[in-house]
Amino acid sequence: YDIGTDLRHELTHGYLHSVQPRIPLWLDEGLAEYFEVARTESGHHADHLAHLAALHRAGQLNLELERLEQVSDPAKFEQTDYAASWLWVSWLLSRPDMTTALAEFFAALPSDASTAPRLSAKLNNLGSDHQRLIREYLEQRIAKAPSLTR
């Protein structure tokens, strides 16, 4: 148990909800998971990476953003969803073009009960093959983690 990790995670939620109470669950959890790790780790979440690597090796990996966007009940958000959300946020923040798209998406979120836009639609409109790119990003992250390539 690490109180620092929990504090960083919960403070991220608190900050996000003070700015945007209608943030989609996947983005809320993805950002909290990304920022819960110590600053020296630069968003690298070894546990999530190991979990995703195991699913990837077993051929059971589903990184579809569209699937994550459909989950709105926190009780139905599973370990794989947290890990995939972290990966999406990590990838989005690693690329200036995607960071801009994420910021624009965040700014467009409604503050009322109206239907929120979907980031997957925005990425599709940008013409990016985000499913291929996120998978390649994961494979690169796995290759850089010596404990996962043995």
Short names for language-model regions:
Residues Y1-D2, V19-R150:
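Acidic/His/Gly-enriched intrinsically disordered linker/tail segments
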Residues T12-H13, E33:
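A broadly conserved amphipathic alpha-helix scaffold signal in soluble, globular proteins
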Residues D2-T12:
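Short alpha-helix carrying the canonical HExxH Zn2+-binding catalytic motif
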Residues G14-S18:
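Short alpha-helical functional segments enriched in proximate histidine and acidic residues
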